[in-house]
Amino acid sequence: ADAPPPAFNQCKACHSIDAGKNGVGPSLSGAYGRKVGLAPNYKYSPAHLASGMTIDDAMLTKYLANPKETIPGNKMGAAFGGLKNPADVAAVIAYLKTVK
């Protein structure tokens, strides 16, 4: 993976980039490009599982800025208000594309 942008510090409070290492949130290893809810051994909220979304630029642009509104009832939205700077959102998305 590339070096994480400063905005990722907010993400790593709950998420690991190591495969199979879940924290409060699921591991982000290989997350970009797959359907939500597929990190092994992580208990997702029913709202997340029902969303059917794919983790891509369009989804992340909305979700990272406002997780509560993008997937109502999800756990992340209850704890994290979102990244307010669009440049931070773009930097985190670019980084997640490199996290295998």
UniProtKB/Swiss-Prot annotation:
Binding site for heme c: C11, C14, H15, M76
Domain of life: Bacteria
GO molecular function, one term: electron transfer activity
Keyword Transport (UniProt): yes
Mod. after translation: Binds 1 heme c group covalently per subunit.
Pfam families, A to Z: Cytochrom_C
InterPro entries named among the record's database cross-references: Cyt_c-like_dom (IPR009056), Cyt_c-like_dom_sf (IPR036909), Cyt_c_1A/1B (IPR002327)
Keywords: Electron transport, Heme, Iron, Metal-binding, Photosynthesis, Transport
Keyword Iron applies: yes
One example of a Gene Ontology biological process annotation: photosynthesis
Family stated for the protein in its record: Belongs to the cytochrome c family.
UniProt function note: Cytochrome c2 is found mainly in purple, non-sulfur, photosynthetic bacteria where it functions as the electron donor to the oxidized bacteriochlorophyll in the photophosphorylation pathway. However, it may also have a role in the respiratory chain and is found in some non-photosynthetic bacteria.
Name the record gives this protein: Cytochrome c2 iso-1
Protein species of origin: Magnetospirillum molischianum
Lineage of the organism: Bacteria, Pseudomonadati, Pseudomonadota, Alphaproteobacteria, Rhodospirillales
